């Protein structure tokens, strides 16, 4: 099975002003929404160097959760051990200033409790042929 990566999935929502950023004011700008989470990023990066990692994690039981799974599948990440659960993903909302620095951010952490049950039930299967684990 090679490398097993265990961890959280986040959706990063990033706002960038089109003109001078006004703290506390209304700012026109562009907004990006990307899949994130350090562990998810690591699994995708490992796959990008043509290794075939297994990702063990949680996603929301929504279309966005399915999008995360689909993108990892497209990168040839084994997604068999990703569970869809309510509140399975975190969210990071960040506002950047004109210099590209984070001016404000709010982070909602996911409930990772279901990972314990998944590892108790399928841990032997997940790790039996693994060479390395990244948490």
Which sequence ranges carry the predicted segments?
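Glycine-rich phosphate/adenosyl-contacting loop at the front of the ribokinase-like
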Residues: 1-56, 65-67
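Structural motif
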Residues: 2, 131-132
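Conserved N-terminal subdomain of the carbohydrate kinase-like
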Residues: 23-26, 48-131
């Amino acid at each position: 099975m090679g490398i097993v990566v265990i961890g959280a999935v986040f959706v990063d929502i990033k706002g960038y002003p089109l003109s001078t950023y006004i703290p506390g004011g209304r700012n026109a700008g562009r907004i990006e929404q990307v899949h994130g989470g350090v562990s998810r990023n690591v699994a995708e990066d490992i796959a990008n160097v043509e290794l075939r990692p297994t990702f063990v994690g949680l996603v929301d039981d929504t279309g966005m959760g399915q999008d995360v799974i689909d993108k990892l599948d497209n990168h040839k990440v084994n997604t068999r051990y990703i569970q869809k659960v309510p509140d399975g993903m975190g969210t990071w909302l960040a506002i950047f200033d004109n210099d590209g620095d984070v001016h404000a951010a709010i982070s909602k952490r996911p409930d990772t409790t279901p990972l314990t049950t998944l590892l108790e039930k399928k841990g032997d299967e997940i790790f039996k042929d693994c060479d390395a684990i990244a948490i």
